Amino acid sequence: PGHQDFSEDTYRTLMAADSAVMVVDAAKGVEDQTRKLFHVCSLREMPIFTFINKMDRDAKNSFDLLEDIENVLGIHTYPVNWPIGSGKEFKGVYDRNSKKILAFTANNGQKEVEKKELTLDDPALEDTIGYYHKQDLFDEIELLDGAGDEFDLEAVRNGQLTPVFFGSALTNFGVEPFLEQFLQLTTPPLPRETVDEKVEPMSDFFSAFVFKIQANMNKAHRDRVAFMRICSGKFEKNMEVFHVQGNKKMRLSQPQQIMAQEREIVDEAYAGDIIGVFDPGIFSIGDTICSPGHKVQFRGIPTFAPEHFALVRQKDTMKRKQFIKGTSQIAQEGAIQIFQELDAGMEEVI
């Protein structure tokens, strides 16, 4: 949130996701880019899980943050845990399910702080969080239980209710409980709409769509990877597939799963998995790949209207070929859009 160049690439990634994590800055509340991307999620009725971050810094009132999310984004909230203080007075979070307090200790420059569990009737509670924080916590729990929304898993999975968690990612406080709950509450791979039908993830035939293309990920040599989301069936290394937009059969070489700088060659993958395959320049964003015996075509991924324009021309006319190839490749990756006059060449483009 807050990054101005964030939306289109993130939008395409959201098209491949089944649920989303919304990170909200506790000091700023909902930002403009969050609003834009949330709109995309709500159109798809995606489950959204909210993590309110930076509680160890000065923050807005927790009730105001929930109200901000509900009013600005139009989604109901259910705090799964509740913060005790904020900034220098941040003492931890209370888990409403387990009825336990996860106490926060000052990190003194450490990347991960020590965690201490307490119950509401623990004699050490007052010494740990302080008398006033204890009284505030009891009052706020009573208010949440009496006036807050009830937890409804079906509403979460329909994108109508967002579970809210508080913590501090920098000190890794509250992150692990959040991820554990996320795994329990999020949906399995969901069905996908095609032009003619709805494809179920447990279908026997293989289908996938390309949502991202990235060049030069390997510094050792120029490469180009097409990332695809598998929607149904089982993918196997070197299997024959049908490229719908190219109208031809092909074999996908070097399938891999990528995590940051790490690459791992995969022999098989299933619905919900993301794989990257070598792209010799034939794939475009939104393309469908499927089993030759069962052809489907997923709906394309819309593009955003451009916001920044520039007139581009090559300095060296002897390098026209490289200029055309380079700009075309960047356009295929979805980073830019190219406009040119009808019947005009590529000497000068927008």
Question: Where are the predicted features?
Answer:
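Structural and coupling elements of P-loop NTPases
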Residues: 1-350
